[in-house]
Amino acid sequence: TFVKYIEEGKGGWIGFHHATLLGEFDGFPLWQWFSDFMGGVRFQNYIAPLADGTVLVEDKKHPVMKGVQASFVVPDDEWYTYDKSPRPNVRVLASVDEATYTPASDIKMGDHPVVWVNESKKARNVYFQIGHSKRLYETEDFTKMFRNAINWTLGK
C-alpha cells in the first residue's frame, strides 16, 4: 500500500532520521524498494556521541528551502553515514560540512547529503537525515524547513 501511495502520487511523504537506518537488523532483511526510494543507500555508521554540524543549503530554489539561511548549525545530532552518497539518485537540497563536527569525528563519508527529495516518484517527498535530538526542533531554520516541507508535500 505504501509503495502504491508513493509510486502513484496519492499524497506526500516526509521522512526523518531513522528512516534511512537501512540494512539487515534484528533478523529483518533490507527492504530494497525503500532503499532505492532513499537514493540506494545502506546504513554504514553513525557519529556518537552527538555532534553539532553545519548544514549547507545546496538548492535554495526548492520550496522546502524557502527562507532558510545558506548555512546553519544543527545541534547535538547523530549523523548517519551510508555505503555511498545518494546524490546520483535524488535531488539534494542540503548537505553537512563534515569538517564542522563538534566534537570532531573520524567517521565521515565525504559527499554527505542530509536533506533530499526523490523526483523519480510521483508523490512529493522529502527526507531529513537530521532529527535525532529534540534540540533540532527548537532551531529556526529547521522549523522553517519542516513547515515548508509540510506545505510542499501537501501541494500548497
Task: List the model feature ranges, each with a label.
Residues 30-39, 74-76, 82-90, 131, ...:
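Oxidoreductase and adenylate-handling cofactor-binding alpha/beta cores
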Residues 5, 33, 46, 80-82, ...:
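Sequence-level detector for tyrosine residue identity
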Residues 13, 19-23, 70-72, 98-100, ...:
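Solvent-exposed loop/turn segments at secondary-structure junctions
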Residues 99-156:
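Extracellular ligand-binding/catalytic regions of CAZymes and related secreted enzymes
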Residues 40-122:
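Catalytic beta-strand/loop cores that center a nucleophilic Ser/Cys/Thr
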Residues 1-67:
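A glycine-rich, often tryptophan-bearing local segment used as a flexible ligand/cofactor-contacting loop or short
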